[in-house]
Regions:
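Short, glycine-/Ser/Thr-/acidic-enriched flexible segments
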Residues: 243
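Catalytic alpha-helical scaffold of carbohydrate-active enzymes acting on polysaccharides/glycoconjugates
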Residues: 1-201, 215-238, 246-312
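Aromatic- and acid-rich polysaccharide-binding/catalytic face
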Residues: 198-210
């Protein structure tokens, strides 16, 4: 893709899912990112954890933890974006969502611009089979949901107590939907970010490159992939959990650090997710995704999801 700002020939950024994040396990990672000139996006939970639902990734620090809040505020002051990953680690009715968003605003001085749904929260917007538009995709999604026994997702269902779609549309500019096994997301989703008229409560969607933990992240941005991203003039929005193996005992994973250092020496645009998506919108006049592109994107995601169920 041509037309990046300044001398940049490609773009790279990261959306960090807050699951499991603490000051101790992600702090060193952000120091590394900052020192190398990357400005990325970190998500947070504004409300305290629901203790009965802290299994798996549904744990970590929140904006109610004083030292963690100071850390998050410092990151924002340094140019990182702070985004939303739902208002907490469990289901939230409309009033809880409103309270969480207000706390986010009170602590950081503004509402979040970027959001991703959290795992199986019932307040997720267009999640589960709601992510899919094609009939074949929805059928496959329903089969998957049956076998996984997932709960309904109702953040976009106006009759539900979990509805907050109108609030999402009012405050949130960008929501992540699919993750793909590709470093250059514009190869599979050239209309980035995109609006889907079938999902009116989301202003714009974006697609990410899968790299959930340090191993898959490093494999996704290996040397050959970096060079291809640069050669193609592509865009990479990594989706990851910096809490999952990126630092141990205060020391950043050496392979991760080496790959980032190499990438930082290239002529890339290294800005947060919302800033990158804002820029991309200035380069085109049409933001509505066409059926063929969306159907192809869905098929690719479904195939990847079947092979790697943990993918988001």
């Amino acid at each position: 893709m041509a037309g990046f700002a300044g001398k940049s020939t490609f773009a790279f950024t990261v959306f960090d899912d807050t699951d499991g994040s603490t000051l101790e396990n992600v702090g060193p990672v952000y120091t590394c990112l900052s020192d190398l000139g990357f400005r990325t996006t970190k998500s947070v939970w504004p409300l305290p954890l629901v203790a009965a639902h802290t299994s798996g990734g549904s744990t970590g620090a929140t904006l109610h933890d004083r030292e963690y809040l100071k850390f998050v505020q410092r990151l924002e002051n340094e140019g990182f974006e702070i985004a939303l990953h739902g208002v907490r680690n469990h289901d939230s009715t409309r009033d809880v969502v409103e309270r969480g968003l207000q706390i986010f605003c009170d602590r950081l001085g503004h509402y979040p611009r970027t959001h991703t749904n959290h795992y199986r929260n019932r307040d997720n917007v267009y999640w589960g089979t709601g992510r899919l538009a094609s009939a074949a995709g929805r059928a496959a999604g329903r089969a998957w949901s049956f076998f996984k026994r997932t709960a309904p997702y109702e953040g976009h269902v106006e009759s539900s107590p979990y509805f907050w779609g109108d609030i999402c549309k009012q405050h949130i500019e960008y929501v992540r939907n699919f993750t793909v096994d590709e470093i250059n997301v514009t190869r599979v989703n050239p209309t980035l970010p995109y609006h889907d008229s079938a999902k009116p409560f989301v202003n714009f969607w974006f697609t990410s490159s899968e790299g959930a933990d340090v191993g898959s992240f490093c494999e996704r941005i290996n040397e050959a992939s970096q060079d291809r991203l640069e050669a193609e003039g592509g865009i990479c929005i990594m989706y990851t959990h910096f809490s999952e193996g990126f630092s141990e005992g205060g020391t950043v994973n050496p392979r991760f650090k080496s790959l980032l250092r190499r990438l930082s020496r290239k002529n890339g645009l290294f800005v947060p997710v919302a800033e990158l998506l804002d820029f991309l919108r200035t380069t085109r006049t049409e933001g509505n995704i066409q059926h063929r592109e969306l159907a192809s994107l869905e098929r690719r995601w479904l195939k990847y999801k079947l092979r790697y169920p943990r993918s988001r």
